[in-house]
Structure formats: structure tokens, C-alpha cells
């Protein structure tokens, strides 16, 4: 297996222009495909997850032109649901942002589809979404294990009425249903069971739907009403924001060992909830400055904090490794959905933090990290999880090197991450 050893970094200084957001890129690609008219997406993320969505759209008959650097895509919208005359199999890797929304969208039109992916995708739950789709008349079958991909879908349309979705595990189930609901046969009312996790990701979904001409009535995240008679309409140009989750590593690095780092492509008006990572970093003692399209982080005397991170679960992973450089204990709470991400992130994070010497308590939905005066050089297993690799790169900000196993797993969202980090290292 390939590995990368990062030598100790003395100081972090500079500017980073963020790659496009994964969450925004795949949502916008799907809506551009369903919309009437042509959409030009700029600052599109070039990564594995986006490639899986683009490959799927090709098989579904969508025409698009992708620029040479793969960051601009002109999509010719179908102006209707997908329809195929022959059965189609879509391989979606480990891309939850492709699997869940496509599973819902393919129920709308006509044709027979199989959705599958990598072994880990077959361990990521989809039962809450399928249950809701079936309640709306969809024809969905599990091909291997109940509640998990791969799925067989026969397009029959979605019937009007009320459905319930369990919101306690992943917001992607709700996102998937919301994006398909405007093309149902009548009004759809979605009731949320349990406490909805990752609400800011639903805000992203609703915001992008509105940019494509569809309004959703949001009753305090407990009920969503999608009136019939709406159609997705291409907005013309669509700028994909920089990826706020990816910003977290650079903002944290500056807080630990700046200098300062200016991150461009996101700012105080960003639609992504993960920009709230900067607020958490500020609570820990970092010096944060906000602009319309940038965030600056400067070194601070960091201290451990106890906080609920349910609203920013992806960026919260970066807090876990930042905690190695804080004074006192850091508690990351209400992040059960780490367990159903690219890997079981609670277990993986606890295991790897212990390798570098930290004292760690892992609970059902929390992790508590106590730093130690001296970290240990360790080989970090990344579990084919891009965020594990990027989070643990921060260990190099100590006086010890860190070895990252399978560093290319960052290609899921940020293929040139380590080059960007090196460019900031003094």
C-alpha cells in the first residue's frame, strides 16, 4: 500500500482557493439534468464522487460538455424525469451524494435501473429513503441485504400525499426525496420522524432547488410541503461555492501554527453550514476574520471545548485532530452519523488518535480527546476515507512526522490536498 510521510511543519502561511463543494456540485448536476434549459456550472469539483454522478448522467441520456480541467460543465437539461428503454446499471462508487438522490429521481420516470457501488456503499444504510419512496408508490427492491444497496428500481412515478422520513441518521435521505418531489404526480408532504440531523445540509438543498425555480414550504424542519405544478428551470450560470468542509483543514492549521491562512471561495454569506467550523475554531481560541468571499484564520492559544456538532458533522472531524494542540479536554458530541459515513468515523478516529498518543473516550455518539505533551510518530490508517487522511495531516504541525497510509483516498473530494498543504508550509 502506498503511504506518505509528512515531516514536521514549522509554520503555515498563505492563501488557498478552495475546490468546489461536493454537496453543491452533485445536487446542482442532478437538478441541471432534470431542468428545462441549459446550465453552465463553474468551479465544479473534479473528484471521484462527481465523476460517478457524471458517468451516471451519461448512461441516463443527459448531454453535457466538460472543460479540460473538469471544473466547468455545460448541461443540456432534459426538462423531464429520466427515461430509458433498456435496463441500465449505475456504479456509484462510495458517493452517497449520488446514490441517495439518484435512487429517488429514478423512481419518477420510466425504465429499469440497478444502483450499486463499492463494498463500503453496500454497508451504508438507505432503508429510511426506500421506505418513504415505497410509501409514495415507488417500485424499489433490495438486491442483496435489506435496507442497503444495491437497489433495483422500476420507474413508476411518485404518487401525491404524505410520507414520513426518519431524519435521525442522515439528512441525505430527506435531500433525495425533496429534490424528486416537485416532479411527483401531485402535492407531496414530508413529515420528519425523530430529530433531523445535519440541518444545514437541508438548507443547501432548499437553496439550490430555489435557484432552479422550485419553492418548498419548510415548517420548522418537521414538515416540508412541495406544491405540484413546479418545474426545474435552468438558471443559466451556476457558480459552485468552494467546499467549506475542505476549508476546515487549512483554517485549523493556521490556528495551530500560523501565520495566517486566507481561504477563498467561501465567506460569511455561504450556503454551506460547514462554514460554522470557523466559529467553533474561534471558540477554541483562533483569530478568525470573515469577508464576503473569504475567511482568514490566525494562530491562537487553543483550548479544549465541549460542544454539540450535529449541525456540522464532516467539519467536526477536524476538531478531533485540532484537539491534539489544545489545552485541556475537547468533547465532540451528538455525531452518531459519523458511524454511517465513508467508514465508522467514531471508531476510526478513536483508534488513530490513540496511535499518536492521545487519551480518547469513544461513546455511541461522542468522542472525548485529551492531548498529551508529546505526540508519537505513527502510520495512520485512512479506511478509504478522504477526511481521515486530511484530518491526520495536521499531526505534522507538531514536532513529529506523521505517515498517512493510502493518501490518494483524498481523490474522493480533494485530489491535490497534500500539494495545497505543502504550498502553505514554511
UniProtKB/Swiss-Prot annotation:
Principal location: cytoplasm
Binding residues annotated for 3-phosphoshikimate, in chain numbering: 22-23, 27, 170-172, 198, 314, 337, 341
Pathway: Metabolic intermediate biosynthesis; chorismate biosynthesis; chorismate from D-erythrose 4-phosphate and phosphoenolpyruvate: step 6/7
The UniProt record lists the keyword Amino-acid biosynthesis: yes
Binding residues for phosphoenolpyruvate: 22, 96, 124, 172, 345, 387, 412
Broad class of enzyme this protein falls into: transferase
Protein name: 3-phosphoshikimate 1-carboxyvinyltransferase
Organism this protein belongs to: Vibrio campbellii (strain ATCC BAA-1116)
Amino acid at each position: 500500500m502506498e503511504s506518505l510521510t509528512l515531516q514536521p511543519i514549522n509554520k503555515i502561511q498563505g492563501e488557498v482557493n478552495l475546490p468546489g463543494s461536493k454537496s453543491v456540485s452533485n445536487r446542482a448536476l442532478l437538478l441541471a439534468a432534470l431542468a428545462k434549459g441549459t446550465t453552465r456550472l463553474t468551479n465544479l469539483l473534479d473528484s471521484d464522487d462527481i465523476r460517478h454522478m457524471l458517468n451516471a448522467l451519461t448512461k441516463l441520456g443527459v448531454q453535457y460538455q466538460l472543460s479540460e480541467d473538469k471544473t466547468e460543465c455545460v448541461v443540456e437539461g432534459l426538462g423531464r424525469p429520466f427515461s430509458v428503454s433498456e435496463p441500465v446499471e449505475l456504479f456509484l462508487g462510495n458517493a452517497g451524494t449520488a446514490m441517495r438522490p439518484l435512487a429517488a429521481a429514478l423512481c419518477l420516470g420510466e425504465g429499469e435501473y440497478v444502483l450499486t457501488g463499492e463494498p463500503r456503499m453496500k454497508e451504508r444504510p438507505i432503508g429510511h429513503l426506500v421506505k418513504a419512496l415505497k410509501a409514495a408508490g415507488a417500485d424499489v427492491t433490495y438486491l442483496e441485504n435489506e435496507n442497503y444497496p444495491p437497489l433495483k428500481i422500476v420507474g413508476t412515478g411518485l404518487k401525491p400525499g404524505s410520507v414520513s422520513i426518519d431524519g435521525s441518521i442522515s439528512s441525505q435521505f430527506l435531500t433525495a426525496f425533496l429534490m424528486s418531489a416537485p416532479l411527483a404526480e401531485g402535492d407531496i408532504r414530508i413529515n420528519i420522524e425523530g430529530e433531523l440531523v445535519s440541518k444545514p445540509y437541508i438548507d443547501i438543498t432548499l437553496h439550490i432547488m430555489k435557484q432552479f425555480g422550485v419553492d418548498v414550504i419548510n415548517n420548522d424542519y418537521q414538515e416540508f410541503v412541495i406544491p405540484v405544478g413546479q418545474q426545474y428551470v435552468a438558471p443559466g450560470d451556476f457558480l459552485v461555492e468552494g467546499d467549506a468542509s475542505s476549508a476546515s483543514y487549512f483554517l485549523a492549521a493556521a490556528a495551530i501554527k500560523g501565520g495566517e491562512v486566507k481561504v477563498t471561495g467561501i465567506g460569511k454569506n455561504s450556503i454551506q453550514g460547514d462554514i460554522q467550523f470557523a466559529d467553533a475554531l474561534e471558540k477554541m481560541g483562533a483569530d478568525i476574520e470573515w469577508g464576503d468571499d473569504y475567511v482568514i484564520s490566525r494562530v491562537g492559544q487553543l483550548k479544549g471545548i465541549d460542544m454539540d456538532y450535529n449541525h456540522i458533522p464532516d467539519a467536526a472531524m477536524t476538531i478531533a485532530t485540532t484537539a491534539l494542540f489544545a489545552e485541556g479536554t475537547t468533547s465532540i458530541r451528538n455525531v452518531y452519523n459519523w458511524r454511517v459515513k465513508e467508514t465508522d468515523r467514531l471508531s476510526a478516529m478513536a483508534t488513530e488518535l490513540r496511535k499518536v498518543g492521545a487519551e480518547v473516550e469513544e461513546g455511541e455518539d461522542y468522542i472525548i480527546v485529551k492531548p498529551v505533551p508529546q505526540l508519537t510518530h505513527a502510520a495512520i490508517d485512512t479506511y478509504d476515507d478522504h477526511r481521515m487522511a486530511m484530518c491526520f495531516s495536521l499531526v505534522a504541525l507538531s514536532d513529529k512526522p506523521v505517515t498517512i497510509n493510502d493518501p490518494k483516498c483524498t481523490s474522493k473530494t480533494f485530489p491535490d490536498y497534500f500539494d495545497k498543504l505543502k504550498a502553505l508550509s514554511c
